[in-house]
UniProtKB/Swiss-Prot annotation:
Enzyme Commission code(s) on record: 2.1.1.177
Subunit structure: Homodimer.
Protein source organism: Listeria monocytogenes serotype 4b (strain CLIP80459)
Pfam families referenced in this protein's UniProt entry, alphabetically: SPOUT_MTase
Binding positions (S-adenosyl-L-methionine): 76, 108, 127-132
Protein name per UniProt: Ribosomal RNA large subunit methyltransferase H
Localisation: Cytoplasm
Keyword Methyltransferase: yes
Length: 159
């Protein structure tokens, strides 16, 4: 399986870089995983609704340019479906079983995802109703993808 994670902004925190690198190393036994960073749009702290939409649209265009046409796209969105780790694992396994070998996860910037990106996505998932920094979500996502492969194969890790 080829998994691509398209995300807005550069990862700055060393501890997150190290954690993600560790899970990418572990995942290499199961899938080819690549992370594609697109630049975030610089914006002032306080934005009008129109300005927020404009920022999301610009970031969204950058995201869409990185998604392969034949990819199954999963957007991480606060209004997405919440799943258990077992459900997430089963869903990833089904994608592989039904020939969806290219999966792209999308993590938006601090304002979220544009409507165009949400429309392009095949599904939306949420890791809960808490608001988490989008940089931290990268680590959470790669850990859950790793956990999913371990669950599907019945290997020890998931408790």
């Amino acid at each position: 399986m080829n998994i691509q994670i398209v995300t807005v902004g550069k990862l700055k925190e060393k501890y997150l870089v190290q954690g993600i690198a560790e899970y990418l190393k572990r995942l290499s036994a199961y899938a080819k995983v690549t992370i594609v960073e697109v630049p975030d749009e610089k914006a002032p702290e306080v934005l009008s609704d129109a300005e927020m939409k404009q920022v999301k649209d610009k970031e969204g265009a950058r995201i869409l340019a990185k998604i392969p046409d034949d990819a199954h796209v999963i957007a991480l969105a606060i209004d997405g479906k919440m799943k258990s780790s077992e459900e997430f694992a089963a869903d990833l396994d089904k994608l592989a079983t039904y020939g969806k070998s290219k999966v792209t996860f999308v993590i938006g910037g601090s304002l979220g995802l544009s409507e165009a990106v949400l429309k392009r996505s095949n599904e939306r998932i949420s890791f809960g109703r808490l608001t988490l920094p989008h940089q931290l979500m990268r680590l959470v996502l790669v850990e859950q993808v790793y956990r999913a492969f371990r669950i599907v194969r019945g290997e020890p890790y998931h408790k």
